[in-house]
């Protein structure tokens, strides 16, 4: 099936979806209605671009006819030639856009995410930088209209983040933040540095798609759940009733502790959400590691320890090492204005996928 047959099939399906969504039987079936609505929304951009492309093709045909019929009218012929030139340029742009729109979609792109940030090499400075990254993602989420909920956090003595787990919910969250997994390096002069020397520290980021129970069911026999008293600063127990939850997935050893909520059930529900995402991600990584060629055709190598970005404070510079992008906008990016970085990563990934399809 060539690209035009594919596009026509997408348009035919889009029109079929419009009819189905008007069917009373479908409207009364909430689950099916939501699934079909999502499918229609996911194909709308492709169909709109395809219809505009067909209009451009018609304009080219009309302009060519006008040139043939314009003998003896230089002004009309010149106007038709200009329209033909513009339409041919638009045709090429639409063809590139449509190729990208037809690329296989990542099934996780529309999902919410579990975001984990940890201070790594560099002690207190790494923890402080982890806090900077947390603020950056929170502010970026605000610009996108997403909901950002800190589910669990651990701070150190200087107010830095040892570890934080957050849920980010909204439209197409994973599609934009999936490229953030990896090691983020910071170069700056710490507040405690009296000699003005630049130190290098690292924080790690992990982005996992939220996994619903219907998508990945964990056998309860594989879980060990411990209930204990939540502890506050200094280690004292802050609740008379045991509400904190420690959940361990026995086959993998993956562990989650949750004590942010006031009730045991809420802590259990949050712990289950995180452990389901981590276990699913664990096995997805094993499968991905067996597909080296495919992994190398996309952004980075898929290695979670890969250094993906450097934030240089003295030079106000951010460098993404995977795509060779350098921006003298560190303050802007850390304030949550990440679009320029994320858009470049998306474009690079799409280009690489197109190249792999053409080879």
UniProtKB/Swiss-Prot annotation:
Protein's UniProt name: Peptide chain release factor 1
Main location: cytoplasm
Residues that bear N5-methylglutamine: 236
Keyword terms: Cytoplasm, Methylation, Protein biosynthesis
Function noted in UniProt: Peptide chain release factor 1 directs the termination of translation in response to the peptide chain termination codons UAG and UAA.
UniProt-listed Pfam families: PCRF, RF-1
Entry's family note: Belongs to the prokaryotic/mitochondrial release factor family.
Disulfide bridge partners, by residue number: none
InterPro entries reported for this sequence: PCRF (IPR005139), Pep_chain_release_fac_I (IPR000352), Pep_chain_release_fac_I_sf (IPR045853), Prokaryotic/Mito_RF (IPR050057), RF-1 (IPR004373)
Compartments where located: Cytoplasm
SMART domains found in the cross-reference section: PCRF (SM00937)
Record PTM: Methylated by PrmC. Methylation increases the termination efficiency of RF1.
Gene (UniProt): prfA
This protein's GO CC annotations: cytoplasm
GO molecular function terms attached to this record: translation release factor activity, codon specific
């Amino acid at each position: 099936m060539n690209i035009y047959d594919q596009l026509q099939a997408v348009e035919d399906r889009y029109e079929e979806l419009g009819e189905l969504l008007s069917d009373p039987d479908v409207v009364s079936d909430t689950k099916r209605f939501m699934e079909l609505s999502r499918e229609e929304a996911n194909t709308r951009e492709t169909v709109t671009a395809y219809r505009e492309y067909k209009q451009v093709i018609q304009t080219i045909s009309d302009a060519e006819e006008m040139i043939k019929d314009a003998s003896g009218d230089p002004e009309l012929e010149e106007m038709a030639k200009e329209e033909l030139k513009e339409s041919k340029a638009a045709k090429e742009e639409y063809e590139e856009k449509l190729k990208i729109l037809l690329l296989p979609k990542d099934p996780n792109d529309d999902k919410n995410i579990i975001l984990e940030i940890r201070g790594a090499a560099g002690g207190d400075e790494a923890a402080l930088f982890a806090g900077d990254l947390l603020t950056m993602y929170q502010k970026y989420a605000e610009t996108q209209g997403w909901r950002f909920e800190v589910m669990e956090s651990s701070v150190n003595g200087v107010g830095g983040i040892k570890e934080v787990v957050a849920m980010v919910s909204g439209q197409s969250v994973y599609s934009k933040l999936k490229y953030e997994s990896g090691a983020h390096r910071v170069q700056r002069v710490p507040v405690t540095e009296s000699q003005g020397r630049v130190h290098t520290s690292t924080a790690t980021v992990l982005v996992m798609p939220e996994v619903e129970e219907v998508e990945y069911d964990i056998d309860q026999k594989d879980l060990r759940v411990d209930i204990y008293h939540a502890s506050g600063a200094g280690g004292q127990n802050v609740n008379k009733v045991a509400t904190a939850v420690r959940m361990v997935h026995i086959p993998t050893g993956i562990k989650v502790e949750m004590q942010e909520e006031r009730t045991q059930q809420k802590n259990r529900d949050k712990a289950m959400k995180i452990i389901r995402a981590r276990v699913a991600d664990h096995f997805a990584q094993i499968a991905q590691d067996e597909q080296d060629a495919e992994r190398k055709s996309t952004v980075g190598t898929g290695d979670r320890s890969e250094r993906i970005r450097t934030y240089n404070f003295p030079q106000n510079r951010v460098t993404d090492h995977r795509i060779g992008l350098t921006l003298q906008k560190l303050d802007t990016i850390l304030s949550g204005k990440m679009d320029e970085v994320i858009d470049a990563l998306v474009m690079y990934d799409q280009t690489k996928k197109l190249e792999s399809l053409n080879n």
